[in-house]
A protein has these predicted regions:
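Serine endopeptidase catalytic core focused on the charge-relay Asp
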Residues: 83-91, 121-124
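Non-catalytic accessory segments of DNA primases and related replication-initiation nucleases
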Residues: 1-87
């Protein structure tokens, strides 16, 4: 089994549910403050905890809110701009060429003047594979620690939307093999090892009932293969 070493603050933040003072949505820094003061028998500043509620009025996803740069197999400048997002994952150019229609760089329009481009894998519904209902996003690795942002674009339909890379040249309903993964990176890595023209699907995290149901309804004759990790998310 993997062994991890924590300091007190790291342990509290990694395992907040072990502490009675924790409430869903509360700031982890606030939790650390409360727990440490209790351990030291210091008086605790009693105040109403700030719980961050999910946005219920979030704006629906709209691709027009982004500037898009697509990977063009005939233009090296576009390939060069995508390169940093694939380098650390070891995804080679041949694999990028194979999937080039299924990803692009997306820069959100912002009012503060800042500009951040993410590698975006478009999410769609199996029943409407040509419509984009969100983005699975990956950022560039930071120089200081090598870590990178990962998530989904605001307003994405995460409960039903899937990244669907159909390399067969046939309609989705006629597909015979569907390969499932937790991320588009994982799907591309599998193809790089075993380059088979199948349908590659990413759930962008823990799979949902809506994602699975939607795909099964559209591919009733297909065989499905799971390439999920063996961690908690992959078993979800």
């Amino acid at each position: 089994p993997e062994q991890k070493n924590y300091n007190v603050i790291g342990f509290i933040k990694e395992h907040p549910t072990l502490f009675d003072d924790y409430k869903p949505g509360m700031s982890l820094d606030r939790l650390v403050n409360i727990v440490c003061n209790r351990l030291l028998n210091n008086p605790i500043d009693v105040r109403e905890s700030r719980v961050v509620e999910p946005k219920r009025d979030a704006k629906p996803f709209n691709l027009s809110d982004y500037d898009i740069l697509r990977f063009n197999p005939r233009e090296k400048d576009t390939q060069r701009k995508h390169y940093p997002y694939f380098k650390e994952r070891g995804i080679n150019m041949r694999t990028q060429f194979a999937f080039h229609k299924q990803f692009f760089l997306a820069t959100r329009h912002r009012t503060d003047g800042l500009s951040f481009a993410n590698l975006a894998f478009p999410l769609s519904l199996p029943s409407k594979p040509d419509s984009i209902v969100g983005l699975e996003e990956r950022g560039r690795p930071r120089r200081e620690d090598g870590k990178a942002y990962k998530g989904k674009a605001e307003g994405s339909n995460s409960s039903e939307g899937l990244w669907i890379a159909n390399l067969t040249g046939k309609p989705l309903k006629d597909s015979t093999n569907i390969l499932w993964f937790e991320s588009a990176y994982d799907a591309m890595a599998e193809y790089q090892i075993n380059p088979v023209k199948s349908v590659y699907v990413s759930t962008g995290g823990t799979p949902t009932k809506g994602q699975i149901k939607g795909m099964l309804e559209e591919t009733r004759q297909a065989s499905h293969y799971l390439g999920f990790d063996k961690d908690e998310a992959g078993r979800g």
